[in-house]
Design a protein with these regions (language model features):
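C-terminal tail/sorting-segment detector
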Residues: 19, 383-405
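A non-catalytic alpha/beta surface segment that caps or lines the substrate-entry region
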Residues: 51-113
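Active-site-adjacent substrate-binding region
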Residues: 90-91, 214, 218-322
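Acidic/histidine-rich catalytic neighborhood of metal-dependent amide-processing enzymes
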Residues: 104-106, 139-232
């Protein structure tokens, strides 16, 4: 979580609230449990969440300008890749900091393709960088464990991806790890702006940042941060929580001196809500040496319940079709020539649809087809790297990397 001046925050918030949504969507009415959603929520593992937080705090620091943050980036990329998610990419960006053009680690984006509305995206994310503003010294050697801020949120996104990557959905899902949040929401701002510039249809953005601290003796609460324009999206969240965890207090809250990546999406015209621990009694240990498991993350039950609800909300909004996926090894597909520049041939199972996506996740070509060998005209595509995706007659999904000269 980023802290900054209250006056600047209120000025920025006023500007944010004037923005208009790029797209309008209806949200599900959740008045009774879906047994499939409940089954997925029940599979959320405290042990898995704990292991992720423990691993992330084991890096000396995840500060944006240190070598270690690149190691975390690569670890996230490899973790998503092992899940078999359709597309995993590194989103690179540059930014001005202290009047100097800077680079840092990339945003890590994993995209799971929807089968019915692949161009509509449900996005969830958490920043993976950390910061220590208390201990003096060389940034490369000052520990910034960042357990609650924000290994806890990252663990929730990874756990959501671990379970939902085995399912099929109507809409596409993006699981995101943001870089450089602690110095101004830099990574998420770059990505959200790029999405808006390309008119990417984001149905809603869920942000997890600090979900593991519960003050001793205080009743557990989930506080939601959102602007009034996003009340319809927030109402979906309230209703979902009431249906699936009625004992949990869920209400709107604000922090006078802090912000997080949901604001990047608000600013660019997308509905976004931040799921957070108690806004008046959040961890006092963030940005210090003591942001560690057992001190700053002291309630794995809270982290588990927040993640369960987050997973269920994402799955419901994405439109759960089935709770298992069939084998989608790229060996089932042959593409030649690859790299290509004009026409190419796709061979595989009995195909009914071929789609091509750029690395932003946008669909740039779609062909309805029948047969196990299809010729495809790609002369209109700009040079670059793409993902070719095939849906067969049994609704199995296969993907393969495609290079256009």
């Amino acid at each position: 979580m980023r802290r900054f001046c209250l006056m600047l925050f209120m000025m920025w918030l006023g500007l944010t609230m004037q923005a208009q949504h790029l797209f309008e969507h209806d949200y599900p009415v959740v008045q009774q449990e879906d047994s499939r959603i409940r089954q997925l929520m029940d599979q959320v593992s405290q042990d898995s969440l704990y292991a992720t937080i423990d691993h992330m705090q084991s890096f000396l620091t995840r500060r944006w300008d240190t070598p270690m943050v690149y190691e975390v980036q690569d670890w996230l990329y490899e973790t998503y890749s092992r899940m078999g998610i359709d597309t995993v990419l590194l989103h690179n960006f540059q930014f001005m900091y202290h009047d100097t053009l800077q680079e840092t680690s990339d945003n890590v984006i994993a995209i799971q393709r929807g089968l019915v509305y692949p161009d509509e995206y449900v996005v969830c994310g958490a920043h993976y960088d950390s910061y220590n503003h208390v201990t003096p010294g060389n940034p490369d050697t000052v520990p910034a464990p960042g357990a609650d801020d924000n290994a806890s949120g990252t663990s929730g996104i990874l756990e959501t991806a671990r379970l939902l990557s085995q399912c099929k959905f109507e809409r596409s899902i993006m699981y995101c790890g943001w870089a450089a949040e602690e110095i101004g929401l830099i990574g998420s701002a770059a990505f959200a702006k790029e999405c808006a510039d390309h008119l990417l249809d984001i149905v809603g953005y869920f942000n997890l940042d600090m979900i593991g601290y519960l003050e001793e003796g205080r009743e557990m609460q989930m506080h939601l941060m959102y602007v009034n324009r996003d009340s319809t999206f927030a109402n979906y969240i309230y209703q979902f929580c009431e249906t699936y965890d009625s004992a949990l207090i869920v209400k709107q809250g604000w922090i006078s001196g802090g912000d997080s990546d949901y604001s990047s999406f608000n600013r660019n015209g997308y509905p976004a809500v931040h799921l957070f621990e108690h806004t008046h009694h959040y961890s006092p240990f963030i940005h210090t040496l003591d942001d560690i498991l057992g001190v700053s993350v002291n309630s794995m039950e809270q982290a588990e319940r927040f993640t369960q609800l987050h997973l269920g909300m994402v799955a419901t909004l994405a439109g759960l079709i089935s709770t298992s996926v069939d084998e989608t090894e790229t060996d089932h597909l042959m593409i030649f020539p690859n790299p290509a520049s004009g026409w190419l041939t796709v061979k595989g199972p009995e195909m009914q649809q071929i789609e091509i996506y750029n690395l932003l996740g946008q669909q740039v070509k779609k062909e309805t087809c029948h047969g196990s060998a299809v010729q495809l005209d790609v002369t209109s595509l700009a040079a670059g790297v793409y993902v070719l995706r095939v849906v067969d007659d049994a609704m199995n999904v296969y993907s393969h990397r495609l290079v256009i000269h």
